[in-house]
Amino acid sequence: MVLDDLGSSLRGTLDKLQGKTTLSEDDVEEIVKEIQRSLLSADVDVDLVMDLSDSIRERALDEEPPAGTTARDHVLKIVYEEMVELVGESTALPLEEQTIVLAGLQGSGKTTTAAKMAWWFSKKGLRPAVIQTDTFRPGAYDQAKEMCERAEVDFYGNPDSDDPVEIAERGLEETADADVHIVDTAGRHALEEALIDELEAIESAVDPDRNLLVLDAAIGQGAKDQAERFHDAVGIDGVAITKLDGTAKGGGALAAVDQTDSSIAFLGTGEEVKDIERFEPSGFISRLLGMGDLKQLSERVERAMEETQAEEDWDPEDLMKGEFTLKDMRNQMNAMNKMGPLDQVMDMIPGLGGGIKDQLPDDAMDMTQERLRDFEVIMDSMSEAELENPRAIGQSQIERIARGSGTDEDTVRELLEQHKMMSRMMKQFQGMGDGDMQRMMKQMQQGGGGGGGGGGGLGGMGPFGD
């Protein structure tokens, strides 16, 4: 993820306090300077970095660590709380009828974000509709229509009209049954007067409940001026940051939030319509510092299980009752794939997103995903009987399956060994009572190790239980 380098740098800085029980002024100053370097290299605005540094320095020197708390954990808690304060609250988006206008420069990801937001609202039980008003960019209508079809949400646009205001007004009429209207507007390569005039006219015509500014994570230091101009024109209520799965540094968008006195609403984390997260400050910073985010993880697990259950006529609860088959394993892997890239999932698990992940080779995630794909191809080459009873698979079947899947016999055997291990684990879970499961979840929340330092937040709570 785009902010991985920032998170790794911050965790490395805090790890320098490992084993210390007290803090000297020199310790604090070194930590503050390292944090400044990390944030500035991530394109966070200089003024914001200085304000954050002053707060961390003052608290680290003035506050006494609670009894039994290490110097590292004390500073970690301070950094966590101050960074949550820095990114601010999430934009208020009640699950009710509303109209949202998206603004931003061309190429910022407005059209993709419109479809993603519509998909997100649909998963919350509302009926959304996207209204495409961009008459400036060739292909805007086709892209929006295709994205909305993939998201399975209502769409309105008129490729034959060159009047964006008329399209917006007609769109509201044609999609009157929708609960949430998301109006996608045109962009330009620069903040031209024509763009601002058009945006103001659309805003006046549709009278939106909220205006969201869509910013590419690569915007850097230019975010502040851009945000100020849009805010002066229509008033910005929140920011959606896109392309956080790329190589941009991402910190510049925080200046836009500060400049407009608004907050972050959504994060775009990939190319698929489902690759969008509602911004939750405590979980976001918790992940950044290697402490996990169990709330976001549980939402992804629930969504992935529901989708797999619908597609495969498979109930995950059956795993706790009978024999764990290769078919069950394949369904589990399908659900994992639906949760998103493996490195993002690891960031949400306390103890894995920090120290353990930082120690892995750069290509470890890609290799793991590739091996999972190999396993899926192998299982697709098996008969129904083999999927239901893998213990009956002998050498001749292994040879046939390897040929049919285009893999080698060793990889087939590796899959069978992996299944045996998972089958043993499932038997252990089947023997657990509710109390055992609750204790295990509590250990996960408190777990960490490596570069951890605390559990991820559940139910909106931070890793320190505030």
Swiss-Prot record:
One of its GO terms (cellular component) is signal recognition particle. Residues 444-466 are annotated as: Disordered. The keyword Ribonucleoprotein applies. GTP binds at residues 104-111, 184-188, 242-245. One of its GO terms (biological process) is SRP-dependent cotranslational protein targeting to membrane. Gene3D superfamilies: P-loop containing nucleotide triphosphate hydrolases, Signal recognition particle SRP54, nucleotide-binding domain, Signal recognition particle, SRP54 subunit, M-domain. Its EC number is 3.6.5.4. It is found in: Cytoplasm. The keyword Cytoplasm applies. Residues 446-466 have a biased composition (Gly residues). It comes from the Archaea. It catalyses: GTP + H2O = GDP + phosphate + H(+). InterPro entries: AAA+_ATPase, P-loop_NTPase, Signal_recog_part_SRP54_M_sf, Signal_recog_particl_SRP54_hlx, Signal_recog_particle_SRP54_M, SRP/SRP_N, SRP54, SRP54_GTPase_dom. Keywords: Cytoplasm, GTP-binding, Hydrolase, Nucleotide-binding, Ribonucleoprotein, RNA-binding, Signal recognition particle. Transmembrane segments: none annotated. Its main location: cytoplasm. GO terms for molecular function: 7S RNA binding; ATP hydrolysis activity; GTP binding; GTPase activity. PANTHER family: SIGNAL RECOGNITION PARTICLE 54K PROTEIN SRP54 (PTHR11564), SIGNAL RECOGNITION PARTICLE SUBUNIT SRP54 (PTHR11564:SF5). Belongs to the GTP-binding SRP family. SRP54 subfamily. Composed of three domains: the N-terminal N domain, which is responsible for interactions with the ribosome, the central G domain, which binds GTP, and the C-terminal M domain, which binds the RNA and the signal sequence of the RNC. Involved in targeting and insertion of nascent membrane proteins into the cytoplasmic membrane. Binds to the hydrophobic signal sequence of the ribosome-nascent chain (RNC) as it emerges from the ribosomes. The SRP-RNC complex is then targeted to the cytoplasmic membrane where it interacts with the SRP receptor FtsY. Part of the signal recognition particle protein translocation system, which is composed of SRP and FtsY. Archaeal SRP consists of a 7S RNA molecule of 300 nucleotides and two protein subunits: SRP54 and SRP19. This is Signal recognition particle 54 kDa protein.
